[in-house]
Amino acid sequence: MILASVLGSGPRGGPPLRPLLGPALSLRARSTSATDTHHVEMARERSKTVTSFYNQSAIDVAAEKPSVRLTPTMMLYSGRSQDGSHLLKSARYLQQELPVRIAHRIKGFRSLPFIIGCNPTILHVHELYIRAFQKLTDFPPIKDQADEARYCQLVRQLLDDHKDVVTLLAEGLRESRKYIEDEKLVRYFLDKTLTSRLGIRMLATHHLALHEDKPDFVGIICTRLSPKKIIEKWVDFARRLCEHKYGNAPRVRINGHVAARFPFIPMPLDYILPELLKNAMRATMESHLDTPYNVPDVVITIANNDIDLVIRISDRGGGIAHKDLDRVMDYHFTTAEASTQDPRISPLFGHLDLHSGGQSGPMHGFGFGLPTSRAYAEYLGGSLRLQSLQGIGTDVYLRLRHIDGREESFRI
């Protein structure tokens, strides 16, 4: 019946579901030949994806292969070559690895309960993955730099195509929320899908960045990352959002190992830090609505050692109610009013675009911010923990393993 949905007719002859790729295609005559050609091309593209529902053998074979995860150290010390051979090696690794990882996620979409998998928005994301698999597997073997350059164009296109996947998944699950009976199954699906997406984007962006000659960077790895500087960048961003919504924002004090520098990948911090800072600022402002221009500071402490980096964010936002404490790290698919839920659970700052530059798309709303940050931290060999002092405030502990520390690093 999923196939019937893709083809445009509902189950058992019911009303047609919204097609996966936006407006329904119509092959009726158009007033101009250009319009006709456009729609024929769209129909042809869509037919390829539909055909894949019949012929899944390539996806099935790829899904049975294990992914080959790299440590950041491997990526950092793979070296540069004058003849560009490091780029060919990196591209060939991606050409082998990306289809396998995408096939794993397609298998994950198939495992969803039928009624959820039929949701048009979820189907749209499912199709994005199938289309990506087809484009990647159709690409010929990379033999020279010209092939590698064309492969980079494909990778950029796919990164752009998938930039809104987090928001789409949240919307689709919100639309299907009344059909969700096993929340553990959905949480497992989301954890795997979102962390796999992070890994794929990190690997793909790393390869593209290898073409750049940026000081203190090898690909996406910063060789001298300053936690203080990246925190300050996102503090400024979160304060602007907070001022836009509330007319004011808490001051932020940073202490601890403020001079620390070490090799690290900024990208996961660029996903996680805005969420944690927005949470702290919103909780602070919401709990001081009577005195919005006299609010307590948010305090951030950096602790660096030879195994991991710990960032503690402490707010005086009243803490988390006992009834909400056990579920703040769960994915929530409702949009309840802030007056009836802890600010960390309800959508954060409405639906503003929270990531300038569009690097990751908005990771907000629908109660996805904290659980997604938790999943990312765990994927990177770390953790995200909350300690609530009800009536006072909340301490959030973000722990991330070093890529060149005394213990084995995480794998991407």
Curated annotation (Swiss-Prot):
Residues binding K(+): V328, D330, F333, G367
Top EC class of this enzyme: transferase
PTM-bearing positions, type N6-acetyllysine: K192, K233
The keyword Mitochondrion is assigned to this record: yes
Post-translational events: Autophosphorylated.
Positions bearing Phosphoserine: S31, S52, S356, S360
Annotated transit peptide: 1-30
Subcellular location, principal: mitochondrion
Sequence positions that bind ATP: N279, D315, T334, T335, H364, G367, L370
Catalysed conversion reaction: L-seryl-[3-methyl-2-oxobutanoate dehydrogenase] + ATP = O-phospho-L-seryl-[3-methyl-2-oxobutanoate dehydrogenase] + ADP + H(+); L-seryl-[protein] + ATP = O-phospho-L-seryl-[protein] + ADP + H(+)
Keywords from the UniProt entry: Acetylation, ATP-binding, Kinase, Magnesium, Metal-binding, Mitochondrion, Nucleotide-binding, Phosphoprotein, Potassium, Transferase, Transit peptide
GO biological process annotation, one example: regulation of glucose metabolic process
PROSITE patterns for the chain: HIS_KIN (PS50109)
Residues annotated as binding Mg(2+): N279
Any one Pfam family match given in the protein's UniProt record, by short name: HATPase_c
Places the protein is found: Mitochondrion matrix; Mitochondrion
Keyword Magnesium: yes
Annotated function: Serine/threonine-protein kinase component of macronutrients metabolism. Forms a functional kinase and phosphatase pair with PPM1K, serving as a metabolic regulatory node that coordinates branched-chain amino acids (BCAAs) with glucose and lipid metabolism via two distinct phosphoprotein targets: mitochondrial BCKDHA subunit of the branched-chain alpha-ketoacid dehydrogenase (BCKDH) complex and cytosolic ACLY, a lipogenic enzyme of Krebs cycle.
Family membership: Belongs to the PDK/BCKDK protein kinase family.
Protein name: Branched-chain alpha-ketoacid dehydrogenase kinase
Originating species: Bos taurus
Phylogenetic classification of the source organism: Eukaryota, Metazoa, Chordata, Craniata, Vertebrata
Gene encoding the protein: BCKDK
